[in-house]
Curated annotation (Swiss-Prot):
This is Carbamoyl phosphate synthase small chain. Pfam families: CPSase_sm_chain, GATase. It comes from Salmonella typhi. Keywords: Amino-acid biosynthesis, Arginine biosynthesis, ATP-binding, Glutamine amidotransferase, Ligase, Nucleotide-binding, Pyrimidine biosynthesis. The keyword Lyase does not apply. InterPro entries: Anth_synth/Amidotransfase, CarbamoylP_synth_ssu, CarbamoylP_synth_ssu_N, CarbP_synth_ssu_N_sf, Class_I_gatase-like, CPSase_GATase1, GATASE.
Length: 382
């Protein structure tokens, strides 16, 4: 039986469609993502916590879902908005269609709405709070009340909500078409010990580190610098994550202590913003953020353009950079800051999401640079 669904934005705009997920309601900040593929990775990316994701590509669900493509152990997106759900999921890796997957994870979703209109509205007015209600006779008044009551992401610390509860080891490399997901590697085959802070880490980013010889100790977001330094890491990785970096004072203080050492530090997304804050810069909330797999970014050092995956609603304010932070990357969409490098320490960061799968691989050299810094640190420490 087909059930109705309704999306209402905080400005009162309504979109009527049909429910393709769980019955109930979902409230969050409505954003749009321009990726053509990777919807399962998007749904399970912890960076989308408290967000309702609109996918601009018209056909979503063509290839179904499978366990190997999950970026974390659960769906983190608050809700899903799409134009059309295909009747058939066709792929040799498919184990469950998208609608069944959403229902199993209790995710409210709506289809058959004008996603182009919604995206243009969000671009013009900025990201808005919204509410999806799915079921018999959705109540528009109730949806509007819930949308207006949502506090928004500004000032909200979600990293400590999505982080791991316990420290764990990670030694699995990346998926390949020939062999699929590999078995975990022996730690004897991984010469570099990297401590990875989980602010909402994606599995594929961890896999890219393992591909380059790193054995990972993944720690909760609120782990102290003293605990990490006792682990004698060769490098420290600051992961991606959701929401506003400014309230994460525990992470900022830990990073400040790492910057008093010569241990290499590499930050991605939220980790990039936290490194900037720990170095004395400031961050700002963006109008509608960057969400997609086709964002051009200029590498200022190499004078080349990279196509990158992006997922962030906050950015580092370039005007606030102290003298010891050098700009390395800038967005060619809006000129916002995309990368920094400390001039006095082996620490650098990138705003986008270097991807193992399914996104672009242009930013992979950033991982290679991290390994170069680790090798130099190890040789200098001897």
């Amino acid at each position: 039986m087909i059930k109705s669904a309704l999306l209402v934005l905080e400005d009162g705009t309504q979109f009527h469609g049909r429910a393709i997920g769980a019955t109930g309601s979902a409230v969050g900040e409505v954003v749009f993502n321009t990726s053509m593929t990777g919807y399962q990775e998007i749904l399970t990316d912890p960076s989308y916590s408290r967000q309702i994701v609109t996918l601009t590509y018209p056909h979503i669900g063509n290839v179904g879902t499978n366990e190997a493509d999950e970026e974390s152990s659960q769906v983190h997106a608050q809700g899903l908005v799409i134009r059309d759900l295909p009747l058939i999921a066709s792929n040799f890796r498919n184990t469950e269609d998208l609608s069944s997957y959403l229902k199993r994870h209790n995710i409210v979703a709506i289809a058959d709405i004008d996603t182009r209109k919604l995206t243009r509205l969000l671009r013009e007015k900025g990201a808005q709070n919204g509410c999806i209600i799915a079921g018999d006779s959705p109540d528009a008044k109730l949806a509007l009340e819930k949308a207006k009551a949502f506090p928004g992401l500004n000032g909200m610390d979600l990293a400590k909500e999505v982080t791991t509860a316990e420290t764990y080891r990670w030694t699995q490399g990346s998926w390949t078409l020939k062999d699929g997901l590999p078995e975990a590697k022996s730690e004897d085959d991984l010469p570099f010990h990297v401590v990875a802070y989980d602010f909402g880490a994606k599995r594929n980013i961890l896999r890219m580190l393992v591909d380059r010889g790193c054995r990972l100790t993944v720690v909760p977001a609120q782990t102290s610098a003293e605990e990490v330094l006792k682990m004698n890491p060769d490098g420290i990785f600051l992961s991606n994550g959701p929401s506003d970096p400014a309230p994460c004072d525990y992470a900022i203080e830990a990073i400040k202590k790492f910057l008093q050492t010569d241990i290499p530090v590499f930050g991605i997304c939220l980790g990039h913003q936290l490194l900037a804050l720990a170095s004395g810069a400031k961050t700002v909330k963006m109008k509608f953020g960057h969400h997609g797999g086709n964002h051009p970014v200029k590498d200022m050092d190499r004078n080349v353009v990279m196509i990158t995956a992006q997922n962030h609603g906050f950015a580092v304010d370039e005007d606030s950079l102290p003298a010891n932070l050098r700009v390395t990357h800038k967005s060619l969409f809006d000129g916002t800051l995309q990368g920094i490098h400390r001039t006095d320490k082996p620490a650098f960061s990138f705003q986008g999401h270097p991807e193992a799968s399914p996104g672009p691989h242009d930013a992979a050299p950033l991982f290679d640079h991290f390994i170069e810094l680790i090798k130099h640190y190890r040789s200098s420490a001897k």
